[in-house]
Amino acid sequence: MPLTEEELKLIEETLGRKPNQVELAMFEAQWSEHCSYKSSRKHLRKLKMDSPWVVKGGDAAVVDFGSVYVAFRIESHNHPSAVDPYNGAATGVGGIIRDILSSGAKPIALLDDLIFGDLDENLVKWHVKGVVKGISDYGNRVGVPTVGGETWFDPDFTRNPMVSVACVGVCPKDKLINGTPRPGDLIVIAGNYTGKDGLLGSSFASKNLEEGVEEEYAAIQVPDPLMEKLLIDSILEMRDERLLVFVKDLGGGGLATALSEVAASFGLGVEARLDALHLREPMEAWEIVVSESQERMMLVIRPEDLERAKKVLEKYDVPYSVIGKFTDTGRVVLYYNGEKVADLPAKFLAEGPELDRPYERPKWHLELELLPPLPEVDLGDAIRKVLSSPNVASKRWIYEQYDHEVQIRTVVKPGEGDAAVLRLLEDPPKGIAVATDSNPRYTFLDPLWGAADVFLEAYRNVVASGARPLAAVDQVDAGSPERPDRFWFFVRMIDGLAWVEREVDVPIVGGKVSFYNEDDVTGKQIKPTVMITMIGKVENVYNAKRARAEEGDLLVLVGETFPELGGSEFLWSVHKLVRGKPPVPRPSTEARVAERILKAIKVSGVTGVHDVSVGGLAAAVAELAKGFGATLELDKVKGPWKRPEEALFSESGARYLLAVKPEAAEEVLKVTGGTVVGKVGGGPLRVLLNGKEVASVDDFEDLLENGMTSRLV
C-alpha cells in the first residue's frame, strides 16, 4: 500500500529533503501495517508479555522449561495463500521455521490453523488442496513434523482463506542466540539468491484483495525447502561453535526491515553495499532492498569469527555475502555500485508513525445479540447434521498428508488427542503439549468474549493432555483498520485477550496481526478471528492423555452446562444461523476445573480426556466413543439448561469429558466434582432423557469420518 500524504510529509520534514526511489521503497515496506504495526501497536501494549518463565519475546517467544528453552511462534500468510495457495502456504511454513531458528532453537514441530470458505465452492476446494499440499511438501522435505492444527469452514472466508502456521523449537539453555551487536560487527546474508519474487510482499499484505489479483503474483515468494534444511543445519552448527551474535529472518520487508529493525533495537547504524549481495538476476537497488525472496537470513558475526563461519556455510553449500557492518551513527546507509542510494535514521525508519485510529461498534452488530425462538428439532437429525459438519468431522484427509513422525518426538499424534504431545529428548520423560485454536463465529458475534473463549479452549486442550499451560502466542486477523466499524473488532479482541491471559496467568508472549482481510469484489470482510497457540509442560509423556475410551468405560462430565447456543455449531448446522452471544468466558472457573483435571489424570483408571467445545456434548461423546458407541443420559448433565438441545449442543467452557474405568469412578468423582453422564459401548450413539430414548444415531462414526472428506474429494 503506498505511503499516505501525511506519511510522505512526515518523511520529508524529518529528512529535510525528498526521499529517493530506494528510500521510498524502504519506507513503503517498513511502514506497511505488516511490518510496522502502526495501527495495532497502541493496543498490543495491553498484552502481558512477561512472566518469570518467559525469557525472550520478539521474532520467537522463548519459555524456560527448566532444563531447556522452548521457542514458539505463529504467523499468517493469508494474502499470498488466497492468490497462490500452494506457494503461499509453503513459504509461510518456511518463514515461521526461520523465526524459530533465529533464536538458536532447533525447529521440532509445526501446527497449522486454517480457515476456509464454503466447502461446496470449487474455489474453496482449490484453496484447501493447495494449502494442505504446500504445508505438507515443505514441512516433509525440511524434516519438521506437522503434529496438530485446527481447520474451520465458513462462507465469509470463500475468497479470503486464513492460513497460519505455528512452529515450536528447542534450544539448550547455554546456546540461545541473543547477543548484542556492536559497531564493527559484520552483516552476512546467508541462504538463497535474491530475486524479484516477493517484491513488496509486505505492502501486498497491507491492502485488500482486488479483482484481477493475478497481477500480484510477483508478490508471492518461491519456496525452496532444501535450502531451508541447509540453513537449519548450518545455523545450528554455527550456534554450537558460538559464532553468531544475532540472527534475523529476512521476511516481510526484506533487507529494509531486517537492517533497520536490528540497528534501531540496539541503538546502532548500518553501512552496507547492496551490490555485494548474491543475486539470482539483474536487479535495481530498490528491488534488492525490498525483495522478500525466501530462505534468507541475516547473520551478525564478529570480524574475528568470520572465517570460521564461512567454512561452516561452505560445508553446507549455503550461499552467503558479507554486505556490510554495524556502525555507531544510528543511520542506515546503503551503497550500490559505489553510489550512496539511501541514508536514513534507523529508528525513524524502523518504528514509523503510531496511529490512534478511531473505532466504534457497527450498528448492525447489535441486532445479532438477539437469538430468535428456535423450533423444536428431531435430536437424531440434529446430531447427524452437527457431526457431519466439516467443522466437527475428522480432518484425517488433511493430517494424513503430513509427516508427523520425523524426529521421533511425537507422542500424541494428530487425531489422537486435544493437544499434540512431544518428547523432550533433552530431558526425558518430560514433554511439551501444544494446541492451536480459533473460532471465527465467536469473535464475530462478540470479539471480546470470543477472543477469551478461543484462548480458554486452547487452555483446555493443553490441560486435557495432562500438561500445565505456560504461555501462548496469538494471530489476529481482521479487516481494514481504516474503517472504525471494522477496527472495533480488532480492538475488542485484544481487550479480551489482555483480560483472559491475566485471569489464568498464561501470558501471550508474541504474535502477529493481519489486517485488510477483505476484498473489493464483494466489499465484505472476513469474520474477525483470533488464533491461539498454547504450550504446556508435561512432566511425564508416558502419562499424557488422549481423547479415547474403551468398552465399558463410564463417561464423567466435569463442569456445568449452561444454555449457551449463541454462535454454536448446532445453530449453524441445524438452523443456518450465526447469532446470539458466544459462551460466557469464565476464566476463574476454568483455572479451578483445570486443577481438578490435572489431579484426576493421575488417577489410575482414567482412559481418556476430551474437552467439550465445538459441537457441544454430543460431539465430545461421539469423538470419545468412536469404535464402541455410547449411551448419554441428559438428565445427569449438571447445569441450568432447560431444553435437551441445550444440554446436547451448548458450547459452554470449563467442561471436560473423561472416560473412566468403573472401579476408578468414585475417586475421579471425588477429585473432580463431576457426574457420570453415560457409558461407552453398545454400538450406536444413544441419548436418553429421564430414562427415555430421545435419539439414536447408528452411523455416527461414518458421519465423523467422512463429513469433511466427502465434500472435498
UniProtKB/Swiss-Prot annotation:
Listed HAMAP family: PurL_2
Source organism: Ignicoccus hospitalis (strain KIN4/I / DSM 18386 / JCM 14125)
Taxonomic lineage from the root: Archaea, Thermoproteota, Thermoprotei, Desulfurococcales, Desulfurococcaceae
Pfam families, alphabetized: AIRS, AIRS_C, FGAR-AT_linker
Record-listed Mg(2+) 1 binding positions: E75
InterPro entries reported for this sequence: PRibForGlyAmidine_synth_PurL, PurL_linker, PurM-like_C_dom, PurM-like_C_sf, PurM-like_N, PurM-like_N_sf
Binding site for Mg(2+) 2: D99, D249
Protein name: Phosphoribosylformylglycinamidine synthase subunit PurL
Source taxon at top rank: Archaea
Main location per the UniProt record: cytoplasm
GO molecular function, one term: phosphoribosylformylglycinamidine synthase activity
Subunit structure comment from the entry: Monomer. Part of the FGAM synthase complex composed of 1 PurL, 1 PurQ and 2 PurS subunits.
UniProt enzyme class: ligase
Keywords, comma-separated and alphabetical: ATP-binding, Cytoplasm, Ligase, Magnesium, Metal-binding, Nucleotide-binding, Purine biosynthesis
Chain's role: Part of the phosphoribosylformylglycinamidine synthase complex involved in the purines biosynthetic pathway. Catalyzes the ATP-dependent conversion of formylglycinamide ribonucleotide (FGAR) and glutamine to yield formylglycinamidine ribonucleotide (FGAM) and glutamate. The FGAM synthase complex is composed of three subunits. PurQ produces an ammonia molecule by converting glutamine to glutamate. PurL transfers the ammonia molecule to FGAR to form FGAM in an ATP-dependent manner.
A GO biological process held by the record: 'de novo' IMP biosynthetic process
